[in-house]
């Protein structure tokens, strides 16, 4: 699977981590917090995007 992902600076990545930790401290699960922050980044990010390939590691 290929996806256009926002290209974030180290500072932006750190801000995302801090936001996730803040949401978790308010009682949100880690999965929900990550999903919410990812959605926020996609909605507000302006800048370059990277192309990433995700492979399924599980053998069927």
Swiss-Prot record:
InterPro entries: UPF0181 (IPR005371). Pfam families: UPF0181. Transmembrane segments: none annotated. Belongs to the UPF0181 family. HAMAP family: UPF0181 (MF_00507). This is UPF0181 protein ESA_01442. It comes from Cronobacter sakazakii (strain ATCC BAA-894) (Enterobacter sakazakii).
